[in-house]
């Protein structure tokens, strides 16, 4: 053998050792097939197992045992005639909103569901004493329970959380959901209203012969409820029902939860009711405002516009329905009619206030009623007229011009006496004189003894030009007396207008008080306040 023999022997030995150490088919034959990234049955490689990885291997083995040949579309019953009993319960986390206009209630709830799946049972002793597993709900059969009275959004649960699986085959699944359920809103006592909203749950495809519901609790679980700032849950109970629909011959079970919720009225009381009451009280002040100020109509119209704005605000809040008018809407409508009536009454009062003798004659019944007895009933005291002075000639003059006419008469008498003295010194008697008796009559042509007799009787002899002057003075006095009488009649009309204002002042106060009582009394008697 040549020198290459040792090299050949060494190469042969290395090849034999390589064949002995390398497994048949190579390392690729021992490598497990790749699994999908989301495959729940996939498990980490043994080299990646942490300390205590034997438990994970046991769970992996249990998963393979449970879901080998499992069909998630078939009902979990041994026989097709068997019924799956689903225990159902509801837990509310938050009452998000109650939309009165669209008549919807938005809630955040947890649907508690529990049933038995005989295909998912195992013996804990065979699998490391594992008594429960959390499995994705997409891998197992779940009942198709939906919200029947859904108003918007998804009917079924959208967030598929994991289910809690027990060794006895019991499946416990509590998925969260946000539902918008339809609710018939009754706004009769708004904002002191109480609503009764329902949530109806049941299987959409399985009738009572396939799936039957059983309540976990008679009431809604409120342990995790987050209080709302607008609504308070008074009561929430569930009832089991079985109903036959027109579409199908089968009977379908359902569990209906009735939520009795009461509105917290503080916000609406501060921002709506109190301002409305204050504006309504301004209507009363319209009749206390004097007619001479000229702002009565302006105040009435301003109040009417303010109430119109409040009515528009309520229209945006309450649902657009013609079935019932809310109590606050009735109150505002009543107040608007009242304010409109006050405008009409104010126009009439202003018309009465500006009447005069040249345009109207006061009837006797108006003078007797509105100037006599009615003011006494309303506790109105009219100041008495000033005391009139008595004229020496018994002429009734106006108080304001009494002094002027008295002085004029006195001066005339002095002039007449002086003139008579002048004629007496000359030895003559005044050719033409007039006399003024105590009753205001003029006498002319008196002379001699007759004139002396007239003077003794208190009458005065006047010259012709003095007689004309005196007649002018009496004309002025009569005109002033006529103006004084007209002014007195005008004051009577103004007082009649004041009495009418006072009548409606008390009438509006009473009606406003009764309207306020009528606003709060019905909800109080109904137990909503």
Swiss-Prot record:
Q: Mind listing the GO molecular function terms for this protein?
A: acetylcholine receptor activity; acetylcholine-gated monoatomic cation-selective channel activity; heterocyclic compound binding; quaternary ammonium group binding
Query: What is the topology of this protein in the membrane according to its UniProt annotation?
Result: Multi-pass membrane protein
The set of disulfide-linked cysteines is 183-197, 247-248
The record places the following residue ranges in the Extracellular compartment, namely 27-264
UniProt cross-references to SUPFAM superfamilies, sorted A to Z: Neurotransmitter-gated ion-channel transmembrane pore, Nicotinic receptor ligand binding domain-like
Keyword Cell cycle assigned: no
Q: Which UniProt keywords apply?
A: Cell membrane, Disease variant, Disulfide bond, Epilepsy, Glycoprotein, Ion channel, Ion transport, Ligand-gated ion channel, Membrane, Receptor, Signal, Synapse, Transmembrane, Transmembrane helix, Transport
Glycan-modified residues: 79, 129, 235
Coarse class of the protein's main subcellular location: membrane
Impact upon substituting residue 115 to A: Changes ligand activation kinetics in a alpha-2(+):alpha-2(-) subunit interface (in LS nAChR subtype)
Instruction: Give the record's GO biological process terms.
Output: acetylcholine receptor signaling pathway; cellular response to nicotine; membrane depolarization; modulation of inhibitory postsynaptic potential; monoatomic ion transmembrane transport; monoatomic ion transport; neuromuscular synaptic transmission; response to nicotine
Indicate the secretion signal residues: 1-26
Quote the PROSITE patterns the UniProt record gives.
Answer: NEUROTR_ION_CHANNEL (PS00236)
Q: Which InterPro entries match?
A: Neur_chan_lig-bd, Neur_chan_lig-bd_sf, Neur_channel, Neuro-gated_channel_TM_sf, Neuro_actylchol_rec, Neurotrans-gated_channel_TM, Neurotransmitter_ion_chnl_CS, Nicotinic_acetylcholine_rcpt
The protein's annotated catalytic reaction(s) are: Ca(2+)(in) = Ca(2+)(out); K(+)(in) = K(+)(out); Na(+)(in) = Na(+)(out)
| Regions crossing the membrane | 265-289, 297-315, 331-352, 503-521
Q: Where in the cell is it found?
A: Synaptic cell membrane; Cell membrane
Q: What is the associated disease?
A: Epilepsy, nocturnal frontal lobe, 4: An autosomal dominant focal epilepsy characterized by nocturnal seizures associated with fear sensation, tongue movements, and nocturnal wandering, closely resembling nightmares and sleep walking. Seizures, benign familial infantile, 6: A form of benign familial infantile epilepsy, a neurologic disorder characterized by afebrile seizures occurring in clusters during the first year of life, without neurologic sequelae. BFIS6 inheritance is autosomal dominant.
The record's similarity note reads: Belongs to the ligand-gated ion channel (TC 1.A.9) family. Acetylcholine receptor (TC 1.A.9.1) subfamily. Alpha-2/CHRNA2 sub-subfamily.
Name the chain's protein: Neuronal acetylcholine receptor subunit alpha-2
Native organism: Homo sapiens
Q: Which gene is this protein's source?
A: CHRNA2
């Amino acid at each position: 053998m040549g020198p290459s023999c040792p090299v050949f022997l060494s190469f042969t030995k290395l090849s034999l050792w390589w064949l002995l150490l390398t497994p048949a088919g190579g390392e690729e034959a021992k490598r497990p097939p790749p699994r999908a990234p989301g495959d729940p049955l996939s498990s980490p490689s043994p080299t990646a197992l942490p300390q205590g990885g034997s438990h994970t291997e046991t769970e992996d083995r249990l998963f393979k045992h449970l879901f080998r040949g499992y069909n998630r579309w078939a009902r979990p019953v041994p026989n097709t005639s068997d019924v799956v009993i689903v225990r159902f319960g509801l837990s509310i986390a938050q009452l998000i909103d109650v939309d009165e206009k669209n008549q919807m209630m938005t809630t955040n709830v947890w649907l508690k569901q529990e049933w038995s799946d005989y295909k998912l049972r195992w013996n804990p002793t065979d699998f490391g004493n594992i008594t429960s597993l959390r499995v994705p709900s997409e891998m197992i059969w779940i009942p198709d329970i939906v919200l029947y009275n859904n108003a918007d959004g998804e009917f079924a649960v959208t967030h598929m959380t994991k289910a809690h699986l027990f060794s006895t085959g019991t499946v416990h699944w509590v998925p969260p959901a946000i539902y918008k359920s339809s609710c018939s809103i009754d706004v009769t006592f708004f904002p002191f209203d109480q609503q009764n909203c329902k949530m109806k749950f049941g299987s959409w495809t399985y009738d009572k012969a396939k799936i039957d519901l059983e309540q976990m609790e008679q009431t809604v679980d409120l342990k995790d409820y987050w209080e709302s700032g607008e609504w308070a849950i008074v009561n929430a109970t569930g009832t089991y029902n079985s109903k036959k629909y027109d579409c199908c011959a089968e009977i379908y079970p359902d569990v209906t939860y009735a939520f009795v919720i009461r509105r917290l009225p503080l916000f609406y009381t501060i921002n709506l009711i109190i301002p409305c009451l204050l504006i309504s009280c301004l209507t009363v002040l319209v009749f206390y405002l004097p007619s001479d100020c000229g702002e009565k109509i302006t105040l009435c119209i301003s109040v009417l516009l303010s109430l119109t704005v409040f009515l528009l605000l309520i229209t945006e809040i309450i649902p657009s329905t013609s079935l019932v008018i809310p109590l606050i809407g009735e109150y505002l409508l009543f107040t608007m009619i009242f304010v409109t009536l006050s405008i009409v009454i104010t126009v009439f009062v202003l018309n009465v206030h500006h009447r005069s003798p040249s345009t109207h004659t006061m009837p006797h019944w108006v003078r007797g009623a509105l100037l006599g007895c009615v003011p006494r009933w309303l506790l109105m005291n009219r100041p008495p007229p000033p005391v009139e002075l008595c004229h020496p000639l018994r002429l009734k003059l106006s108080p304001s011009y009494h002094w002027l006419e008295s002085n004029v008469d006195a001066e005339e008498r002095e002039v007449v006496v002086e003139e008579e003295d002048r004629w007496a010194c000359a030895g003559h008697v005044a050719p033409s004189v007039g006399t003024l008796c105590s009753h205001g009559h003029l006498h002319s042509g008196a002379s001699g003894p007759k004139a002396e007799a007239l003077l003794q009787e208190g009458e005065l002899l006047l010259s012709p030009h003095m007689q004309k002057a005196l007649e002018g003075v009496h004309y002025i006095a009569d005109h002033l007396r006529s103006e004084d009488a007209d002014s007195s009649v005008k004051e009577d009309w103004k007082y009649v207008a004041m009495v009418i204002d006072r009548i409606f002042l008390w009438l509006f106060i009473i009606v406003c008080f009764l309207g306020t009582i009528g606003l709060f009394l019905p909800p109080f008697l109904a137990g909503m306040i």
